[in-house]
């Protein structure tokens, strides 16, 4: 069961992705996707034309399993700048977005009946992915600084998790951000108790005021962390393009996924388009635009709620 947006219990999962626009004058807060005016058709048209102007035939082939090398190099540069920490392109594995990444990780690093620790509450559709793999969900309480480490330690005394799923920055639905100290504690506990940390960092780059603590992607050298990123929130969900940043040994295990061995690089064409968007500076300028626009909208909504 899951909670509907009206707060009532529902036995059916809600569909949260659609193509239709809300009625005039309606702002739909029940769907985690950009408004129509923040879907950059012109930008992507420019990037696509730039790619096709110089495209080589083999660039339309299946592509290497880890993802296009040129795209991964461009993405590594973006993350290095954003994280203020070196990111190696070999640590990046291209995905079709964070939902697919989470599904891959559950299938590759957990077995039916295994425990997965999550923040309580957490992104409600992640529950369905865990259920698809027969995983047992164990909730860990949070406060204003994110997942409570003492509660995690206590739960580790009675449960052995295969995975810990966390949304460290700008949590959905709670809004809190995991402090730097707690991020380090989670990483240390993952090594001590031999579980993998799945950090859903889809909001890490969408800071409107102060920057969040360093991404958990900067800790992947520890060996037990998989950092999930996506262009769904910082460009367009329809691109279905994202990445997993992790250690070399975990990348090797991801390369063993059957669908990767069969089909090669995921969203290979889209990867080329985004590489050109990055190289042209379009991705960086669009991200600045999103931050400023969302900051203004947050301030407008906050002021309206305070008036009420």
Regions flagged by a language model, labelled:
Residues 36-38, 173-176, 263:
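A generic structural signal for short coil/turn motifs at secondary-structure boundaries
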Residues 5-97, 278-285, 299-300:
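N-terminal small-domain helix-loop-helix segment of the aminotransferase-like
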Residues 196, 206, 234-236:
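Short glycine/serine/proline-enriched coil/turn segments at secondary-structure junctions
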Residues 221-295, 299:
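Conserved core segment of the aminotransferase class I/II
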């Amino acid at each position: 069961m899951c909670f509907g947006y009206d707060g009532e219990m529902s036995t059916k999962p809600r569909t949260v992705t659609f193509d239709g626009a809300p009625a005039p004058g309606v702002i739909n807060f029940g769907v985690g996707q950009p408004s129509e005016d923040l879907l950059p058709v012109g930008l992507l048209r420019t990037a696509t034309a730039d790619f096709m102007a110089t495209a080589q035939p083999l660039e339309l082939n299946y592509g290497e399993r880890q993802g296009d090398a040129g795209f991964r190099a461009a993405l590594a540069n973006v993350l290095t700048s954003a994280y203020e920490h070196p990111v190696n392109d070999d640590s990046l594995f291209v995905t079709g977005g964070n939902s697919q990444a989470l599904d891959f990780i559950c299938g590759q690093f957990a077995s039916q009946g295994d425990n997965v620790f999550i923040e309580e509450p957490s992104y409600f559709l992640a529950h369905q992915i865990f259920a698809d793999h027969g995983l047992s969900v164990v909730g860990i309480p949070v406060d204003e600084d994110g997942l409570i480490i003492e509660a995690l330690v206590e739960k580790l005394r009675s449960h052995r998790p295969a995975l810990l799923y966390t949304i460290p920055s700008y949590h959905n639905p709670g809004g809190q951000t995991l402090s730097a100290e707690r991020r380090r504690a989670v990483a240390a506990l993952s090594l001590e108790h031999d579980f993998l940390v799945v950090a859903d960092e889809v909001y890490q780059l969408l800071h409107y005021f102060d920057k969040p603590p360093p991404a958990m992607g900067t800790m992947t050298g520890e060996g037990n962390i998989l950092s999930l990123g996506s262009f769904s929130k910082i460009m367009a969900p329809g691109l279905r393009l994202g990445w997993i940043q992790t250690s070399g040994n975990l990348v090797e295990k991801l390369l063993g996924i059957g669908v990767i061995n069969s089909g090669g690089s995921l969203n290979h064409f889209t990867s080329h388009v985004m590489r050109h968007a990055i190289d042209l500076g379009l991705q960086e300028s669009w991200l600045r635009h999103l931050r400023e626009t969302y900051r203004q909208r947050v301030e407008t909504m906050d002021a309206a709620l305070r008036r009420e």
